[in-house]
């Protein structure tokens, strides 16, 4: 699609977004939101089922939990932050970018990601016990020029969403802000320990508008600080207070293990996050990545079954919590399984190696030496594209954790090398740690999956009738 059409569509959407933000009367806001839905359907109805737009209208009409959630965001977040997030993550990435990505996928015969996760640095101001990224070492950095190259070339193929990890990405906060300013049509999201967030930084974030945060937290003060260091919990709470004060979008990033799973999903813990102003919480299943990684932290089948149900309880319209919970391992139902290998996202480590996933440290391509498209065309990514989904039970999505033989086969077939700079881990060693887990999880996962499919079928029948 030509740039004139893109510009006209973007201006039309921006006009309505501004009007929605200015509306104070709830009924007037509803009318404008429904008008925006109709315009998006007109522009992008060929990319989505009509049902998707109908559900959006129903959500607005029902005035339920998620519509109230949206209204709270519009009323409390900084206007520039809201406007930029809607235009960058919504219009550019979710709608317009999808058409561009589909065209690029057909042209280049490879997966084109919706989001690219990259590590500006391996450096960190903390020394957390068992952090997977520590395996890379602490002296690696992507230059600003390379980060700009990633974003610039990503935009050309429709990627407008960039996630930043590390190390601690805010060690490079000046370069991150520079990227945000240069690419105002992209949304950036940093996974951070939160300790480098201060007033001056928040003021700059509000100005750019296109940077949001996930703050890492492992539980309450005692548990969190036992892994991250004394005083870190209080510093994270202070960072949340600042972000809320400035109206900046933020949530949390939580790694759940056998030891903390009950705590980090408890009402008490979630109520704390909500009271601090968190809008969402990412839950990540512990992964035994690295030669020294312990399998003792892997959740039991009973614990993971609990997690599947608990996340759905938290999100539930009735009796849930006013926070959006996402479970990276257990929400495959909504995204057709594994999203790695460029299907929806990929990872670039601080050495420039382009990996299928933040947890899969194997590659045969490096962004320092190649352009983005050849990196996405690497053999390992092509194997991912051929084999996804790795399991039709989307509670068993991963080629490492739940289907370990799949990763062994792909790495061997493509000759991809370990990207661990300090202690390279063979794929056989990595996947051996997952064999027993996968075997014991399968029966519970299969029963849960059957229950979920039947529940979804029943809900669909009720909606039709």
Which residue ranges define each predicted feature?
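Radical SAM/AdoMet-radical enzyme domain recognition
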Residues: 144-164, 170-285
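Short, charged low-complexity linear segments at domain edges
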Residues: 92-113, 322-328, 332, 366-382
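Conserved alpha-helical substructure of the radical SAM core
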Residues: 33-200, 465
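Short loop/turn microsegments at loop-to-beta-strand junctions
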Residues: 116, 342-344
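Radical SAM enzyme [4Fe-4S]-AdoMet core and its adjacent flexible, acidic
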Residues: 1-54, 58, 225-341, 350-351, ...
């Amino acid at each position: 699609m030509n740039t004139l059409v893109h510009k006209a569509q973007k201006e039309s959407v921006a006009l309505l977004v501004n009007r929605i933000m200015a509306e104070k009367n709830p009924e007037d806001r509803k009318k404008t939101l429904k008008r925006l839905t109709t315009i998006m359907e007109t522009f992008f109805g060929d990319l989505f089922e009509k049902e998707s737009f109908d559900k959006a209208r129903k959500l607005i009409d029902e005035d339920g939990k998620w519509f109230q959630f949206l209204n709270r965001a519009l009323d409390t977040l900084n206007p520039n932050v809201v406007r930029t997030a809607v235009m960058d993550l919504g219009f550019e990435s979710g709608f317009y970018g999808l058409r561009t990505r589909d065209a690029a996928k057909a042209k280049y015969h490879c997966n084109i990601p919706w989001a690219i996760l990259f590590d500006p640095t391996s450096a960190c101001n903390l020394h957390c016990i068992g952090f997977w990224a520590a395996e890379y070492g602490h002296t690696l950095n992507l230059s600003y020029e390379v980060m700009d190259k990633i974003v610039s070339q990503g935009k050309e193929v429709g990627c407008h969403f960039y996630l930043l990890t590390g190390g601690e990405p805010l060690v490079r906060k000046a370069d991150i802000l520079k990227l945000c300013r240069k690419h105002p049509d992209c949304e950036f999201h940093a996974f951070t320990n939160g300790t480098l967030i201060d007033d001056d930084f928040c003021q700059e974030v509000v100005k750019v508008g296109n940077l949001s945060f996930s703050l890492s937290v492992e539980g309450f003060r005692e548990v969190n600080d036992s892994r991250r260091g004394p005083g870190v919990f209080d510093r994270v709470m202070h960072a949340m207070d600042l972000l809320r004060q400035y109206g900046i979008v933020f949530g949390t990033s939580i790694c759940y293990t056998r030891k903390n799973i009950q705590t980090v999903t408890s009402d008490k813990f979630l109520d704390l996050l909500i009271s601090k102003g968190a809008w969402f919480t990412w839950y990540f299943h512990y992964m035994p990545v690295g030669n020294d990684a312990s399998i003792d932290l892997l959740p039991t089948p009973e614990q993971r079954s609990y997690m599947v149900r608990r996340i759905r309880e938290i999100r539930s319209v009735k009796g849930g919590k006013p926070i959006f919970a996402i479970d990276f391992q257990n929400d495959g139902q909504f995204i057709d399984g594994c999203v790695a290998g460029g299907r929806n996202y990929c990872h670039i480590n601080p050495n420039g190696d382009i990996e299928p996933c933040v947890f899969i440290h194997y590659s045969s391509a490096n962004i320092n030496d190649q352009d983005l498209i050849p990196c996405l065309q690497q053999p390992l990514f092509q194997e991912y594209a051929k084999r996804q989904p790795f399991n039709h039970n989307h509670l068993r999505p991963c080629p490492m954790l739940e289907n370990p033989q799949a990763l062994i086969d792909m790495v061997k077939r493509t000759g991809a090398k370990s990207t661990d700079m300090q202690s390279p881990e063979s794929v056989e060693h990595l996947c051996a740690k997952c064999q027993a887990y996968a075997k014991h999880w399968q029966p519970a996962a299969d029963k849960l999956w059957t229950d979920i499919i039947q529940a979804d079928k029943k809900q669909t029948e009720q909606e039709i009738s």
